[in-house]
Amino acid sequence: MSADALLPLLKSTFGFDHFRGRQSEVVDRVMAGERTLAVMPTGAGKSLTYQLPAVALNGCVVVVSPLIALMHDQLRGARAAGIRAASLTSVDADWAETRQAYRDGQLDLLYVAPERATGEGFRSLLEAQTPALFAIDEAHCVSEWGHDFRPDYRLLRPLLDAFPEVPRLALTATADKHTREDILVQLGIPGDGLILAGFDRPNIRYAVRPRISPAKQLVDFIAANPGPGIVYAPTRNGTERLAEQIAAATGRSVAAYHAGLDPERRARVQHDFVASEDGIVTATVAFGMGIDKPDVRFVAHAGLPKSIESYYQETGRAGRDGDPAEAMMLWGADDFARARMRLSELPEARVAGERVRLNALAALVETVECRRALLLRHFGENPPERCGNCDNCLEPGRQVDATVLAQKLLSAVYRTGQSFGAGHIEAVLCGRSDERIASRGHDKLSVFGIVAGEEARLIKPLVRSLMAREALDTTEHGGLMLGPAARAMMKGETAVLMAEPPVKRTQREGGRTSRADRAAANPVGDPLFDALRAMRRELAAEAGVPPYVIFHDAVLRTMASQRPATRSALADIPGVGGKKLEAWGDAFLNVIRQF
C-alpha cells in the first residue's frame, strides 16, 4: 500500500489532506517493508511517519525512544488521535496489562526505552507477537560520532536482527555526515535507505550577541517574545539566578530546572511548562529533549552550547508548530576558555573531534555572514548566501580588518607576562596608568598607549574574537595568555577580520520580527481566538493533557478566521481528525456560534 493510498486515513486520523515535505517518501518505504533512516528537521512531522503506518499495518509498531517524558507526551497525542498506544517504562504501573494487550493484538503503538528493549523479557514478548515495524527515535544516540551517544542504543542491533523481516525506521533531526553513516551501519540500514529531508527551520530567527549584561539582555529579549520559552544556562546556579531575575523583571511565571532538583520537583516543572501557554523554564541542557511541546516561541542560550549539533537541537525546540520563533545566544570569551579546559581533560582519541566541533561554534558566533547558511553548511547542505531571517541578514554589520590591532593586543599580553585580565591589557594599550600598572612598570612598556580613538572600542570585542580563534587562552586565575594561533597572527601570517560592534544595539535583542508576523502567530486581542483558547484550556484540564494535544494554535486561528458552523465544515480544517472532532468538535462550535 502506497502513501497516497493512505491519504483518507491521514485525513480521518490526523485531519491533514496531504503529507508535508518528504513524509510520503518515508511512509512509502515503511509500507513497502524497507529499512530507512529519515533525517528530518524538528517540526517536520517525524512521528507521523510511524504513527500513520501504525494505524494502517496489521500488528503493533514498536517505538524505541530515549526519554520517558517524551514517550508519555507522544503517547497522549497518539491516544487523542484515536491510536491505541501504550508504553513500557520504569514509571508505568500497568506493565502486565500492557504486555497482555500487546499479546492480544490490542495495540497499534508500543513505546519502550532502549534499556527495556534490549532485555530478554522484551524479546520474548515480541516473539509472541511479531511487531509490524521497529521505529528508532533519536537515532543519533546510536553513534559515537553523535552529540548524544547512548551505549544502550548500540545494544539494539541484536534485537532488530532477531526479526529480520520486520522493517526498520530510524529517525533523527540532528546528524552530520559522519553520524548518518554510522547510524546506517549500526542499525543495519542500506545506504539507499537514507532520506535526507534537510535541516532548515525557516520559521526560527537566529541571533547571536556578545554577553555583556546577560540578565538585562535576556529580559529585553523575553519582553519582546510572548509565549512559552526556554532559557539554557551553563550551570545549576545560573538557572536559579536567572529564574529569579527574569521573574522579577517580567512578572511572568519562571521555573528553574536542573539535575540537582529532586525528581518530583523536576517532573512538576516539566508538567507545568508543557501545560502552560506562556511559562518560561531556565534550565541546563538536560531539559527539553523529553519535551513534545510544539508551541515554544523562543529558546535563549545564556552561554555557549556544547556543539553546533547541540545548538541546532536545542534551538529546534522552538517553533515546532511552524509559527515564527526566536533563538538567541549570548556568548563570552570565558565560554571558550572553559571549553578548551574541558578539551584538555578528554581522552586523546576524542580531542581532535571535539576541537573541530568547538571551532565550528567559534565560526558561528564570529561570522558576519548569514548564520543560517553557516549552520546548514555544517550539515552538508548548500543554502543561499542570505536567509533574510537571522541577525546578520536583518542588521548587516561592517567587517573591519583588525590584524594590526590583534598584533598590538597579543604583544601587550606577552609583554605584561601573560597573567593579567582583559581590563588590565586594555588600560595598558590605551595608556591609562594606575597604581597597579605603574607598580609593575607596565607604563614603561613599548605597548603602553599605542591604541587610541576608534581602535580602543574594538579591544574587548577583539579579545572575545581571539579567544574563539585560539589566539588567546586564560590562565587558571583568569589572566590572558597566548594560545596556539597567536604566533601566526603576531608574525602577520594570519589576517584578523571581525564584525565592527554597533555603537548602540537596539533594545530588541532577538532581531526584528515584524509585528504582523507576531500578530499572525498569536492574535491576542481577537475575542474569538481568545475564547477558543479558553475553551481549549478547559477541555485540556478535563482530559488531563496539555492544551496543544487538543488543537494547535494554528487550528484555532483557522477556526477564528473561517468560523465553521457545522461539524463537516470544522472537519475540513487541517488538524481536525475524526477522533478529535467527535470528542471536542461541538464544544468549539458552540464557542464560535456565540460570536
Q: For each of these PLM feature ranges, what is it?
A:
Residues 2-13, 17-21, 25-47, 55-57, ...:
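Helicase motor core with emphasis on the C-terminal RecA-like subdomain
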Residues 350-381:
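Short, charged low-complexity linear segments at domain edges
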